[in-house]
Amino acid sequence: MNMMQVMQSVVWAVLLWPCLVSLGVPLECKDEQGSIILCASISKEKLLDRVIQHAELIYRVSEESCTLFEEMFVPFPMRSQRNQAGYTCATKAFPIPGSKSEIQQISDKWLLHSVLILVQSWIEPLVYLQTTLDRYDDAPDTLLKKTKWVSEKLLSLEQGVVVLIRKMLDDDMLTTSYYEQGVAPYALQPEVLESVLRDYTLLSCFKKDAHKMETFLKLLKCRQTDKYSCFLH
């Protein structure tokens, strides 16, 4: 087994750890001191399957949150205005493959790296989103709980992957966040209408990126079984 295969196996184990509680899968991945260790008893295939299940769940929750926010706070005429108002997804500028042809051509390593970049880029914006949603008079508890849940899962996921990469690559210069420029646009206190559009854009962009995470992981899964017959739909 080469280094890439070893890295992928351990990445899948660490990626799995934060989501096990939410998925109800009985698995112990920690030692008595609380350190994350490789779940050697679980096959690579099963680990990846559970990671994909977790990614699907995150995407579904993001979709539900976006729909709920839209129904509660966004008048129909405003739903097509967020792009016209100059709001774009912060991750659009990141080196993440976007087109189907680009995604098909990148390596397994870069698929995983892209997932990590997306996770890290959303940690701070989702913390901001929790804060601003708390100021909405009629924000339903369901929306607040969904946002908090996703935020916590992303943070756990990021911490596990960073620890893994530092250990595997012996890279002391690795920081816990690659991208922070996505946070800056949300530091100001906008007016009510602007705030609604901005938060709506955040939720919509996160839903799109959550779908990318799911897509990348499913492509990775496909490549493990039939590398030459994996196509994006």
From Swiss-Prot:
SUPFAM superfamilies xrefs: 4-helical cytokines
Disulfide bridges in this chain: 29-39, 89-205, 222-230
Subcellular location: Secreted
Primary location recorded for the protein, binned into one broad class: secreted
rRNA-binding found in the keyword field: no
Name of the featured protein: Somatolactin
Similarity remark: Belongs to the somatotropin/prolactin family.
Species: Oncorhynchus keta (Chum salmon)
